[in-house]
Design a protein with these regions (language model features):
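Conserved tyrosine-mediated DNA breakage-rejoining catalytic core shared by Y-recombinases
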Residues: 137, 189-247
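DNA breakage-rejoining catalytic core of tyrosine-based enzymes
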Residues: 77, 126-129, 139-160, 215, ...
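Short, aromatic/basic-rich helix-turn unit that serves as a nucleic-acid recognition element
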Residues: 1-5, 30-64
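Catalytic-site neighborhood detector that most strongly recognizes the C-terminal catalytic loop/helix
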Residues: 149, 215-217, 229, 319-344
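A Lys/Arg-rich helix-loop hairpin that forms a DNA/phosphate-binding surface
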Residues: 22-36, 54-55, 68-90, 146, ...
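Short, basic (Lys/Arg/His-rich) helix/loop patches that form interaction surfaces
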Residues: 164-167, 254-260, 265-268, 276-317, ...
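Short, polar N-cap/turn motifs at the start of nucleic acid-interacting alpha helices
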Residues: 193-202, 217, 290, 310-330
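Basic, Lys/Arg- and aromatic-enriched nucleic-acid-binding interface segment
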Residues: 99-103, 107-111, 122, 130-189
């Protein structure tokens, strides 16, 4: 019986190595082709790919698959800048006549090309160094930065509609995103794969919840949390945020433990897609246009703060950013800002005259 079991395990291993879905090192030996480098990047235990969050890996996999399936057979040493431009144009082509160009698709592919070539450079592959030098001198049109944001008036309308729909959790979630200027992930958390037998915390069907706001983040009226992306600790005095405080005070005292935002149906933190689904349902009931997404609450927070005259560095710290340029990327230029600039310019002319 032991012999049979060992033989079964051996055959199982051979099957997995042969399988197209396996990422074992044996299947991912670098042979100079782009495909082999893509697969090595995904399989190598020392690859930076291993440090990515699961959701980011999924995004990367999309672009990597485009390269693997469409230009993977190309020898990296033979790829020129002209080839890369041609690939970009091909990836950008509409899916069907009359449909828009797929700029996001093309940009994702080129971004992943940069990633894997930089990985190859870290392995001191000369062909990757040459192609990397060429790529560093090339620019490609990406998706335009979002210009939408959520306003305070829309948040108020959303809160009202959420309570009418029996979803106080959604009223709380969006209010916290807007008032605190936090990423959605830092408010509602995210569910990460965790199949370990001794998984701790909140676990559901092989997924473990992490990174969301809990009551342990609040001491008195001060909310303090380390953000998931930058690791920067942000602090907010809820006494200065009446909307957020009002929503929190709706929570019964006996429920004030664990995650702040819980799905009324499951009693667990929201899955991302369920949260965004309910956001759209309630947003439509509140008269908020479909082009406004829940993630735009963060841009709304930054824009409102800068419009109100807050110092950019203060806004940067409140949003948990480590660079001012990141904060500026969330700022949606408004008429108030351009009017303020015009007033200052006109006033300066009077002083000169």
């Amino acid at each position: 019986m032991r012999h049979i079991g060992a033989r079964c395990r051996d055959l199982q291993g051979q099957m997995l190595e042969w399988s197209g879905e396996n990422r074992s090192p044996a299947r991912n030996v670098y042979d100079g082709s782009l495909r082999s480098l893509v697969r090595l990047y995904q399989a190598d235990e020392e690859s930076p790919y291993r440090d990515l969050r699961p959701r980011t890996q999924t995004f990367y996999d999309y672009g990597l698959k485009l390269l693997d399936e469409n230009v993977g057979e190309m020898a990296i040493a033979a790829v020129s800048g002209a080839d890369v431009r041609r690939w970009y144009k091909k990836f950008k082509e509409p899916k069907a006549d009359g449909e828009p160009e797929r700029v996001r698709r093309a940009y994702a592919a080129i971004q992943m090309l940069r990633v894997v070539i930089n990985y190859g450079r870290s392995l001191k592959l000369p062909e990757c160094r040459d192609l990397g030098d060429a790529l560093s001198a090339m620019e490609f049109k990406g998706v335009q930065r979002r210009e939408t944001r959520i306003t305070h008036a829309q948040v108020c309308a959303f809160r009202k509609a959420a309570h009418e729909a029996g979803r106080p959790s959604m009223a709380l979630g969006i209010t916290l995103q807007f008032d605190l200027g936090m990423r959605q992930r830092d408010v509602i958390g995210e569910w990460l794969p965790d199949t370990s037998p001794g998984a701790e915390g909140i676990v559901d069907h092989g997924l473990r919840w992490s990174d969301g706001l809990t009551f342990s983040h609040i001491t008195g009226t001060v909310l303090r949390k380390r953000t998931s992306k930058t690791g920067k600790v942000v602090e907010h005095d809820l006494a200065q945020l009446p909307d957020a405080l009002a929503e929190l005070e709706r929570i019964p005292p006996l429920r004030r433990i664990g995650p702040l935002v819980l799905n009324e149906e499951t009693g667990l933190p929201y899955k991302r897609r369920v949260y965004t689904k309910w956001f759209r349902i309630i947003a439509r009931a509140a008269g908020i246009p479909d082009e406004v997404w829940s993630m735009d609450a963060r841009a709304g927070a930054v824009t409102e703060a800068l419009d109100a005259g807050a110092q950019p560095l203060d806004v940067m710290n409140a949003a948990g950013h480590t660079q001012l340029s990141t904060t500026q990327g969330y700022d949606r230029t408004t008429l108030k800002k351009t009017a303020r600039v015009a007033q200052l310019r006109v006033a300066s002319r009077k002083n000169v005259e």
